[in-house]
């Protein structure tokens, strides 16, 4: 009970208590018992003015002396239901005691798949929990457009409820596509440069591949990026990307190596390592997923990469607002091929050379965990979103390698064809807040923090797993990967041959974004934004002075073109601002954001001064020119 002896009496507690009791009774046979079955709360204060005795009175149904407790009778399943057709056209088929009504001569969905999602049984006491689980489980199969469960009273026995399950088939095949575009316009020391990217991603879905409600999704990705500033030169084509991915979902929980069953039986203090409630959620709601992907990127004149990926895991919709994605097994093979121009960059940037080579990511028990939670708008117009991602690779290989070395008394590192196994852990948290003041005025904010760390035999986190900032969906005053790490200044990115090729990344990321969004007229909307953040390295990097995340200033050595010191992280926060325009066509949004740097992560004046003033970090607007603006074009909102 929500009432506690000695606690203050509140009226709202009575409503909660009525709902609690009604829910409990509906799950114990009383199918039609609701909170309105109670009379007004009766409080007796005759014994004391400061204490009261509460009485809850149950009102019987009209014309009855008590509420009826029900058992379940016949269960009939219309697996190909059509409300426009009479019952007479359906064929009867009995499977495991359940009566199926079919329009077609064969089952479109295997009956056992349907029965696995039905948690009601003839002869059982009616349970609202079992009713809700069945409704939710059948809906989650994805092969039914509509799911309805009716309860009909028996004509001869008032204590029996017959169950009628109506399943309307969904379309088996579905085609769709996504279009993504981005545009970045900015300056380097060589003058203005502009990159335009366009990507097309068609998708084909089969909702019942093997007649067991399996969902197969095949996606193709094709993208190209061009440099308009080099229109009549060989440098016009910047990059090409091609990708193919296939995901196969099974509508059941496949316990990988019986790990979850074992953890459910393993004691953990006074409880279990995996609770019965969590194990039940996995069995009821988890869809098992097999995924394979190939991705190819060719950056003209610089490098090309090929990525192969395969994984196995689960997709678990906890409720309408919460989803968990868990991968047990993950295998990635990354193979880069560099051109002489990029080899020059690698020679000048050992950090990039160490993290850009061939990579093999292998996880056998745990690869990735992703938790996303949506917060629906409240009465104040506030809503939100949270996402936590944890990724790890190589732990099992490293442990096995270390165990072998201990027994063999050696220091060998396991490799395949000269390719090292990467060991790293990566954590990222993203939280967003939205506030709607009026239908034409709103506020949006995002905070993002990420941390990546190599362990085992790896010294650096793979380049593709490191963090970066800048670009249309990040700190819009800088190009993607053109900011940081820390106060480091990348002179190579300002070289005469650079085609807006930025590659600066870090092990730690802090980022904050805020937008005031408003309606202009018709389909045109506007925004004023503020972005702040940076990326850092966790360890000192002799090749990127000023890049380390520190709490206090430390002097640097051998940094002729950079700062003679490494500032604390809060002095290296870059700040940008700007305004944007959005054309809202409901199904997609064209966005143009004009970003301007406000504060740099290092002094831009008096560079070699060991005690620069705060003003030395800020942009000088006395000589403001159009070249100071970064033009960012994209589809959809940045967050």
Predicted regions and their residues:
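Gram-negative/organellar outer-membrane beta-barrel architecture
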Residues: 4-7, 107, 127-387, 476-477, ...
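Membrane-embedded beta-strand positions of outer-membrane beta-barrel proteins
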Residues: 177-179, 216-220, 290-292, 386-390, ...
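C-terminal beta-signal and terminal closure region of outer-membrane beta-barrel proteins
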Residues: 469-472, 476-477, 542-639
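Interaction-mediating elements
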Residues: 1-140
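C-terminal outer-membrane beta-barrel translocator/porin domains of Gram-negative envelope proteins
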Residues: 100, 182-193, 323-519, 528-567, ...
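Beta-rich nucleic-acid/ligand-interaction surfaces
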Residues: 40-54, 153-165, 447-448, 452-454
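Extended hydrophobic-aromatic, low-complexity segments
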Residues: 147, 174-177, 187, 212-215, ...
């Amino acid at each position: 009970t929500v009432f506690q002896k000695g606690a203050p009496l509140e009226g709202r507690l009575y409503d909660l208590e009525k709902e609690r009791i009604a829910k409990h009774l509906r799950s114990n046979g009383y199918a039609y018992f609701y909170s309105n079955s109670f009379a007004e709360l009766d409080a007796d204060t005759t014994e004391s003015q400061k204490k009261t005795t509460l009485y809850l009175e149950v009102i019987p149904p009209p014309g009855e002396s008590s509420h009826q407790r029900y058992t379940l009778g016949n269960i009939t399943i219309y697996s190909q239901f059509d409300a426009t057709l009479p019952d007479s056209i359906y064929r009867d088929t009995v499977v495991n005691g359940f009566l199926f009504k079919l329009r077609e001569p064969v089952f479109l969905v295997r009956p056992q798949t349907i029965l696995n999602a039905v948690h009601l049984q003839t002869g059982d006491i009616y349970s609202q929990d079992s009713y809700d689980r069945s409704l939710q489980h059948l809906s989650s199969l994805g092969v039914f457009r509509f799911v309805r469960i009716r309860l009909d009273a028996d004509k001869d026995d008032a204590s029996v409820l017959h169950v009628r399950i109506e399943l309307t088939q969904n379309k088996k095949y579905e085609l769709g596509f996504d279009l993504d575009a981005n545009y970045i316009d900015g300056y380097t020391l060589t003058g203005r440069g502009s990159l335009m990217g366009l990507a097309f991603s068609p998708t084909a879905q089969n909702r019942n591949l093997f007649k067991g409600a399996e969902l197969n999704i095949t996606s193709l990705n094709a993208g190209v990026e061009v440099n308009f500033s080099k229109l009549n030169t060989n440098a016009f084509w910047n990059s090409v990307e091609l990708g193919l991915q296939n995901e196969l979902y099974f509508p059941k929980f496949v316990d990988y190596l019986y790990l979850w069953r074992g953890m459910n039986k393993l004691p953990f203090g006074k409880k279990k390592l995996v609770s019965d409630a969590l194990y039940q959620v996995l069995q009821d709601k988890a869809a098992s997923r097999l995924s394979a992907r190939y991705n190819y990127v060719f950056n003209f004149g610089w490098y090309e990469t090929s990525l192969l990926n395969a994984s196995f895991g689960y997709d678990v919709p906890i409720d309408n607002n919460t989803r968990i994605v868990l991968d047990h097994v993950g295998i990635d093979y990354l193979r880069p091929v560099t051109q002489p121009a990029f080899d020059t960059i690698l020679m000048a940037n050992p950090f990039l050379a160490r993290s850009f080579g061939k990579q093999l990511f292998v996880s056998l028990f745990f690869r990735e965990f992703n938790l996303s939670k949506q917060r629906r708008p409240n009465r104040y117009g506030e809503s939100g979103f949270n996402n936590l991602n944890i990724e790890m690779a190589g732990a099992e290989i490293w442990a096995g390698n270390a165990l072998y070395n201990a027994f063999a008394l050696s220091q060998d590192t396991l490799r395949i064809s000269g390719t090292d196994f990467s060991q790293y852990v990566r954590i990222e948290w993203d939280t967003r807040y939205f506030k709607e003041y009026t239908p034409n005025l709103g506020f949006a904010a995002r905070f993002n923090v990420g941390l990546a760390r190599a362990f085992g035999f790896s010294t650096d986190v793979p380049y593709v797993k490191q963090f970066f900032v800048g670009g249309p969906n990040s700190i819009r005053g800088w190009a993607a990967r053109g900011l940081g790490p820390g106060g480091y200044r990348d002179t190579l990115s300002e070289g005469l041959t650079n085609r807006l090729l930025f590659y600066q990344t870090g092990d730690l990321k802090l980022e904050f974004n805020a937008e005031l969004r408003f309606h202009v007229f018709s389909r045109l909307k506007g925004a004023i934004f503020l972005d702040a953040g940076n990326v850092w390295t966790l360890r000192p990097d002799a090749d990127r002075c000023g890049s380390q995340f520190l709490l206090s200033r430390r002097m640097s050595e051998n940094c002729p073109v950079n700062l003679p010191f490494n500032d604390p992280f809060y002095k290296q926060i870059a700040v940008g601002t700007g305004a944007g325009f959005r054309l809202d066509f409901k199904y997609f949004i064209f966005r143009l954001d004009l970003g301007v740097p406000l504060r740099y992560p290092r002094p831009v004046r008096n560079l070699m001064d060991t005690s620069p003033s705060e003003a030395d970090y800020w942009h000088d607007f006395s000589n403001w020119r159009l070249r100071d603006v970064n033009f960012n074009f994209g589809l959809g909102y940045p967050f």
